[in-house]
């Protein structure tokens, strides 16, 4: 997919990086003075090249994808449980981020034990909620979330 984009970002924290996102510029015309534009607008970190080392390491030997696979697999388990329960998705995401459309009552019940965020109000009684997994999401946490979804 990257070959079809002029510019895209690669997130780091969901795969265990300290912080940050890598900006990948495929179109050389857009790279002209990009570094200076970031610096002038306050987006360049001091010693930021050191942070780049984490991305260089993550891109070696498919490590990024190996780590990300766990997050995606956990999200797919949750997705399957949501769909089995008849809960629609705002978008059918193949990533570690899910956006189930919950009633306000369902969201309230899940928020008692889980950290959800309202992504967008769908109507007066439904919201698309953001559910996100990471490299550190444990099976027990996903199992508990699935049980809570089944109990809705």
Locations of the language-model features?
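Active-site C-terminal subdomain of aminotransferase-like
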Residues: 1-95, 101
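Short, basic, helix/turn surface patches
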Residues: 2-17, 116-122, 147-152
């Amino acid at each position: 997919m990257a070959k079809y984009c002029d510019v895209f970002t690669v997130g780091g924290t969901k795969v265990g990086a300290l912080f940050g996102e890598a900006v990948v510029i495929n179109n050389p015309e857009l790279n002209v003075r990009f570094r200076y534009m970031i610096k002038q607008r306050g987006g360049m970190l001091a010693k930021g090249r050191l942070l780049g080392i984490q991305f260089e390491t993550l891109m070696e030997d498919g490590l990024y994808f190996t780590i990300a696979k766990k997050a995606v697999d956990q999200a797919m388990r949750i997705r399957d449980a949501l769909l089995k329960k008849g809960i629609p998705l705002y978008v059918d995401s193949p990533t570690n981020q899910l956006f189930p459309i919950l009633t306000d009552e369902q969201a309230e019940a899940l928020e008692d034990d889980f950290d959800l965020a309202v992504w967008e109000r769908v109507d007066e009684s439904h919201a698309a909620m953001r559910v996100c997994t990471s490299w550190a999401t444990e099976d027990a946490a996903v199992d508990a979330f699935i049980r809570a979804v089944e109990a809705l």
